[in-house]
Amino acid sequence: MGTLQEKVRRFQKKTITELRDRQNADGSWTFCFEGPIMTNSFFILLLTSLDEGENEKELISSLAAGIHAKQQPDGTFINYPDETRGNLTATVQGYVGMLASGCFHRTEPHMKKAEQFIISHGGLRHVHFMTKWMLAANGLYPWPALYLPLSLMALPPTLPIHFYQFSSYARIHFAPMAVTLNQRFVLINRNISSLHHLDPHMTKNPFTWLRSDAFEERDLTSILLHWKRVFHAPFAFQQLGLQTAKTYMLDRIEKDGTLYSYASATIYMVYSLLSLGVSRYSPIIRRAITGIKSLVTKCNGIPYLENSTSTVWDTALISYALQKNGVTETDGSVTKAADFLLERQHTKIADWSVKNPNSVPGGWGFSNINTNNPDCDDTTAVLKAIPRNHSPAAWERGVSWLLSMQNNDGGFSAFEKNVNHPLIRLLPLESAEDAAVDPSTADLTGRVLHFLGEKVGFTEKHQHIQRAVKWLFEHQEQNGSWYGRWGVCYIYGTWAALTGMHACGVDRKHPGIQKALRWLKSIQNDDGSWGESCKSAEIKTYVPLHRGTIVQTAWALDALLTYENSEHPSVVKGMQYLTDSSSHSADSLAYPAGIGLPKQFYIRYHSYPYVFSLLAVGKYLDSIEKETANET
């Protein structure tokens, strides 16, 4: 019994106790799902444009205060701590949200600083198109001289190009955004008369809405002309597109009134329905507003509008982590969590079935009330959390659905199957390659492999495993790492790939495994920690943070401990850092570890320091026990 082992056991016991104490009566765990200030800003704009200012004064004031609390001393806003020069889109969002609230005024020093930053960076021209859309819907930016091809929505999925070639995330936002844009709808915000002081040269030029980093303007013109030829349609067909878009949205409203349970999509939907003549006082609009309001919470005391809850995800991860640290399957915490999760298994045919028509529903979604949008990541997490014998039929149905979602290339993606059309990837919109398609990713593929190996008992001999492992090695980076799409970033992808392949029996002597282990060890900080910048997701190259984070250190340790023993120097140093109370500073805990959309939406999962630290210390202690047993 060394001092480090004793320290780890104390840490383990403390974390388990904290998690037990935080479990809700219904078996779930609730932690903040904290993203950018965009949601606060957009909801303030919507409420004030709907003349809800007097009725919702307290809510608007708190959301504005939440924005102001995150403003930097120089007046800018940033999406992650080491984005040192300020983020233009985030600063516009913050500035406009505060101004629209009526709680802050242009003459205040912090507002003047934000103005100066925006003006010095070219005004509004280079703001992300989704924020431009929000400004235009509120009469603060001109709609572009461009109509989006809503006729696309009316095309049958049997054609080579159709609406379901876009990712579910893109579709659920594209539909309301396209309707509102094509209707040239404006809901005047009475709290902001104009933003011309930020940009006197606003233009209807559609090229200012498009990505220009990869194309010359002449190339953009040719691409747009190509899309126009593909989707050129008579007026009647365009009207059919409008109606199809409306039906598409209405059919995907959750019981709380939100669209797909996303605050962002719901806000866009409200504008689009208003543009189609739906009354602002109609039940559907009122339920949507109420649903968005239900997502307002406090993250570390700061008012924040979550884009959705993360209840299913958090509950599954925590229950599994507890079980990996000695909490039995029959323990009340585990059984209550299992019952909560079982109630949220999906039972209806939804959009995922377009590309996967022969599978029976059985997956799980991310949020507390999601019934439309299951995903492979949540499904694997839930199936690892629910003991197999707790509900065998539901468990097997989940496994069957998950296996049916394997892509033709052998990998797994987040929401849907085989949604990676090359023409969609080439759309000249910022982040199209990250948001418009849903390709196989190393993190999803690795996490599915981990579940199939650990819980289902699949090995390298199984066809599903062979195809997935082949995909992973084909997509390994030259330096030995893997890129993770939904977490930051190369540490995340490498952790998922290594733990997944180990669970299925891939030998440590494999050159790809050796290369990955060498890479992980090479990026460890001198204090034993690991840390990676969100910048990695933006330039698709590993960028060190030059300081440690608790979550990324836990991922790296978990990965190393799959192939190395507990006495390996990297493991010892890392475990000392992870379990040292001084390491758990605000900076090391608060750094975003999740990615919704690179450059725009980074996520701080408040549950992650608990979950992944616990998994790492549990594996460390298991490793010691196995090594001791082997010695005797």
UniProtKB/Swiss-Prot annotation:
Q: What happens when the gene is disrupted?
A: No effect on biofilm formation.
For this UniProt entry, what is the primary localization, expressed as one broad class? membrane
Task: Return the EC number.
Answer: 4.2.1.137
Q: How does it sit in the membrane?
A: Peripheral membrane protein
**InterPro entries, sorted:** SQ_cyclase_C, SQ_cyclase_N, Squalene_cyclase, Terpenoid_cyclase/PrenylTrfase
Subcellular localization, as worded in the UniProt entry: Cell membrane
Q: Which Pfam families match?
A: SQHop_cyclase_C, SQHop_cyclase_N
Q: Which GO terms describe its molecular function?
A: intramolecular transferase activity; lyase activity
Q: Which SUPFAM superfamilies match?
A: Terpenoid cyclases/Protein prenyltransferases
Q: Which protein are we looking at?
A: Sporulenol synthase
Please give the organism.
Bacillus subtilis (strain 168)
Classification from the root reads:
Bacteria, Bacillati, Bacillota, Bacilli, Bacillales
Q: Which gene encodes it?
A: sqhC
